[in-house]
From Swiss-Prot:
PANTHER family reported in the protein's UniProt record: APURINIC-APYRIMIDINIC ENDONUCLEASE, ENDONUCLEASE IV ENDODEOXYRIBONUCLEASE IV
Name used for this protein in its record: Probable endonuclease 4
GO biological process: base-excision repair
Single GO molecular function: zinc ion binding
Swiss-Prot/TrEMBL catalytic activity: Endonucleolytic cleavage to 5'-phosphooligonucleotide end-products
Cofactor requirements of the protein: Zn(2+)
Amino acid sequence: MLKIGSHVSMSGKKMLLAASEEAVSYGATTFMIYTGAPQNTRRKPIEELNIEAGRKHMEQNGIEEIIVHAPYIINVGNTTKPETFQLGVDFLRMEIERTSALGVAKQIVLHPGAHVGAGADAGIQQIIKGLNEVLTPDQTVNIALETMAGKGTECGRSFEEIAKIIDGVKYNEKLSVCFDTCHTHDAGYDIVNDFDGVLNEFDKIVGIDRLQVLHINDSKNVRGAGKDRHENIGFGHIGYKALHHIVHHPQLTHVPKILETPYVGEDKKDKKPPYKLEIEMLKNGTFDEGLLEKIKAQ
């Protein structure tokens, strides 16, 4: 079975149940959530996440595994502000606890961090320090380090940087990788013409067994732009053919594929989610040039 889904919202009273219902409405077989708003630290207590009803709904609809994304505000790469680093460490610990409580997620996707001017090496050392403070040998969920586009002072823009972080962490069996197609493309990897070559390079430097999550996004920018702006499937510089190849790659059949493509529409208050039609299109093997119009008409 193809494990494919998108980012969905976990909110209101229904929480995990609402997320599962949204995912199922898209024809998804997995999904990704934030356990609260990605841009702040406000979180509902675990008892209010409606876990039991959510898990039951998932089971009824054949969804076995989901992904959690850590909030953007976590930056364990910060060497200049001890309070920012500490917030990141404390909050990551809390996210591990919350994700464990869900019982259906094995991976927490984390943007490794930004060095905020101290240099990549200093940032990487700080990320290692933070992860060493957070990870324990008995935790049941992994931290999936996301491949980054290289925007600003982001660490993790190359496979070498990801490998350096992993190598420095004591309990690194608790680390995996989330491979983001838009980010890797924007960082300069040729996933359009030579994805197999890129995957081989990843295997040599990091190890393909670490690749446990895929973010499937097209890119608004040319390869190597270092920008990180997602585009709808087939409408960017990566293109449908390359993304379809990645989604159906024989070495990655077990890996959940998560779409984070933009909502569609000119009216900011009435943008439509693209995921149902994008998932269908990635399953059926044919690019639909009229997709965006169909999404708007939903």
